[in-house]
């Protein structure tokens, strides 16, 4: 009977719906072992399988998709055109779920469902609840890894030809003996300006917030969350880590809402700084003051940090990257309790302004999310942990276009972004006050290529390991790269590269990168289908315009900019499909809002007074078709212009004309999507 109970206690439910024994005998040698079931890990596994390799996917937890399925539903990406391949397909499938061509905001359970679907379609069973115990190497090659259950029992050996580390922590990379960095480099190390210590003004306390338990009395001690460390000069390197938090999915729908209850160990003194912050200036509402709300479908949220004291637990994660599993579990639990207490404090502490308490009490945990983790996210936002120091280190110069690479295998498109790393006492005009340090938000540059060499270690260290998440980058460059869509792109790259290394019988550092680039470009879904053609208004080779057009770089544009005409004079823009392959295509035109907006379909901003009648001419190389669209509808969405057959050697195009409308007309991007 004891043997039977022991057996049953170690069964877990695999994503395909089959029961899978966690302590099964060692698996046969597989081609590719992916460690980490993050969004990158799923795409890496699927990519390797689609190009013909046997794959095993190992995930330390019990959920798939990482942060994409853990609450980050407001996709962080500066330029949607940078998202390619399986990553773009993911957001297309999200769109299909919600009745659009593609969508960049979604509910957590929908994301996890889609990741499971990808694995099911590929015939991959993820092995969950299996964390890394050790790595076996022969020379510069990993020969096997040993994983164990979360309680440290039932070790299992897994052998593979190639390994991919898709964990947020870089555990496989570290155990394989690969050089890595933790913390922030000094600016001098890579000739950067935004690395190291940065005392700036974003997510900052107002002047004069007293740091002591008893105001003006240092002997009373510091308030909770303030470190005793001294502020170093700007640009100084250190071992601090940008803050982690939970991206919170809440709902205001009473039928689907569970109240935010007082958490275990609740201590209101942990939020005393919030009261002192509010005493300096009482906010009118929660969003953009105490937190940042972004609405998801079905009355749900993705809530992020915003302000001096918010959901970021600054300073509580500095030992996380190299910590033991037990210590990491403590850190994760501390973040969970802090977050629950933060929301409870706002809604229930009588010292909080009543209008903020009332607003907070509108929100609660959704009944239909995270049903096996008490309706609270299963994934802490590990913004940064270890970073590999590989064959090539991405730096600020890459972000700004001052250094370029020829082996690019994916694009990054976000600002150089770091959340705060420390909360300290500083003096200003002789007065001690609390300050957050480390937040950087520097943009103004376009998409830039990520070097393949940043995904592989130095040759002497390991020749069969690819690291697409904890890749080789400085702290500030990593802050631009570290977005979930980019991780998916790099995961796909890693899967294809691992397969190619097997086929070429080479170290991952020595594969034909040109061949890898061609595969990703010409077969982006890895299924042999024709690649789509996306023509953006900034494509000078394919786009011509007549009349007066203003190029705007703000708003909900699809790429870097959008064209706007509204002077009442005739004007037109032609999007030519030069180089398109023959076949049947469904053609779409993107319809952005002129200002603001987060790119959510149907979202309308204060300047949505666009033209109601815009003339469209579609020429597929043989048939010329005219139609009229209303740009006041389907905001931030793709407008379907119908199906068209493109013949070999023809030159199709889509032309948009203003017809002299005094209302603003926008011209952004045209998509030629193959019909399967």
Residue spans for each PLM region:
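Extracytoplasmic
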Residues: 531-676
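Aromatic pocket-lining residues of Rossmann-like dinucleotide-binding sites
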Residues: 48
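Beta1/beta-strand and adjacent pyrophosphate-binding region of the FAD-binding site
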Residues: 27-38
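Conserved N-terminal/central alpha/beta ligand/cofactor-binding core
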Residues: 53-54, 59-141, 181, 189-191
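N-terminal Rossmann-fold NAD(P) dinucleotide-binding loop
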Residues: 41
């Amino acid at each position: 009977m004891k043997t039977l109970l022991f057996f049953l206690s170690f069964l877990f439910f695999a994503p395909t719906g089959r029961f899978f024994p966690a302590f099964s005998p060692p698996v046969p040698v597989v081609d590719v072992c992916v460690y980490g079931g993050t969004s990158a890990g799923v795409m890496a596994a699927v990519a390797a399988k689609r190009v013909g390799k046997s794959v095993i996917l190992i995930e330390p937890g019990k959920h798939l998709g990482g942060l994409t399925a853990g609450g980050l539903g407001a996709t962080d990406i500066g330029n949607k055109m940078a998202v390619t391949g399986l990553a773009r397909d993911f957001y297309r499938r999200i769109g299909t779920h919600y009745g659009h061509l593609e969508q960049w905001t979604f509910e957590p359970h929908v994301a996890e469902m889609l990741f499971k679907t990808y694995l099911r379609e590929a015939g991959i069973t993820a092995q969950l609840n299996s964390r890394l115990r050790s790595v076996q190497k022969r020379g510069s090659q990993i020969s096997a890894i040993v994983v164990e259950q979360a309680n440290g029992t039932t070790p299992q050996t897994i052998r593979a030809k190639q390994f991919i580390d898709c964990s947020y922590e870089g555990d496989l990379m570290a155990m394989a003996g690969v050089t890595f960095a933790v913390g922030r480099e000094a600016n001098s190390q890579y000739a950067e300006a935004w690395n190291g210590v940065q005392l700036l003004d974003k997510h900052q306390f107002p002047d004069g917030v007293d740091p002591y338990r008893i105001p003006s009395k240092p002997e009373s001690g510091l308030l909770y969350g303030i470190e005793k460390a001294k502020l170093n000069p700007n640009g100084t390197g250190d071992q601090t880590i940008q803050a982690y938090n939970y991206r919170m999915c809440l709902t205001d729908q009473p039928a689907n809402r569970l109240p935010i209850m007082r958490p275990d160990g609740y201590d209101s003194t942990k939020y005393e700084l919030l009261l002192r912050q509010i005493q300096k200036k009482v906010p009118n509402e929660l969003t953009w003051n105490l937190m940042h709300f972004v609405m998801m479908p079905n009355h749900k949220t993705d809530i992020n940090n915003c302000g001096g004291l918010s959901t970021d637990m600054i300073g509580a994660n500095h030992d996380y990257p190299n910590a033991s599993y037990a210590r990491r579990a403590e850190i994760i639990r501390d973040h969970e309790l802090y977050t629950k207490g933060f929301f409870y404090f706002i809604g229930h502490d009588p010292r909080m302004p009543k209008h903020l308490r009332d607003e907070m009490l509108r929100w609660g945990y959704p009944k239909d999310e995270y049903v096996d983790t008490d309706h609270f996210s299963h994934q802490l936002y590990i913004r940064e942990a270890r970073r590999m120091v590989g064959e090539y280190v991405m730096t600020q110069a890459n972000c700004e276009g001052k250094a370029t690479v020829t082996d690019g295998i994916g694009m990054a498109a976000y600002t150089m972004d770091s959340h705060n790393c420390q909360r300290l006492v500083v003096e200003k005009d002789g007065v001690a006050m609390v300050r957050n340090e480390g937040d950087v938000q520097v943009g103004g540059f376009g998409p830039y290529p990520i070097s393949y060499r940043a995904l592989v270690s130095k040759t002497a260290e390991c020749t069969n390991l690819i690291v697409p998440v904890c890749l080789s980058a400085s702290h500030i460059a990593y802050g631009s790269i570290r977005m979930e869509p980019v991780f998916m792109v790099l995961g796909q790259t890693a899967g294809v590269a691992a397969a190619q290394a097997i086929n070429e019988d080479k170290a991952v550092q020595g594969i034909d990168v040109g061949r890898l680039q061609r595969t990703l470009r010409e077969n982006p879904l890895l299924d042999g289908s024709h690649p789509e053609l996306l023509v953006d208004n900034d494509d000078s080779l394919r786009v011509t315009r007549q009349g007066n057009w203003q190029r705007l770089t703000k708003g909900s544009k699809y790429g870097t900019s959008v064209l706007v005409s509204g002077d009442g004079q005739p004007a037109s823009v032609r999007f030519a499909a030069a180089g398109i392959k023959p076949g049947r295509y469904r053609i779409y035109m993107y319809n952005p809002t002129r200002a603001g907006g987060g790119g959510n379909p149907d979202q309308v901003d204060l300047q949505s007074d666009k033209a109601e009648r815009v003339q469209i001419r579609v020429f597929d190389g043989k048939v010329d078709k005219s139609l009229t669209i209303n740009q006041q509808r389907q905001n931030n969405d793709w407008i379907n212009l119908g199906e068209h057959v493109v013949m070999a050697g023809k030159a199709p195009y889509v032309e948009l004309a203003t017809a002299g409308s005094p209302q603003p007309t926008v011209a952004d991007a045209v998509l030629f999507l193959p019909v399967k």
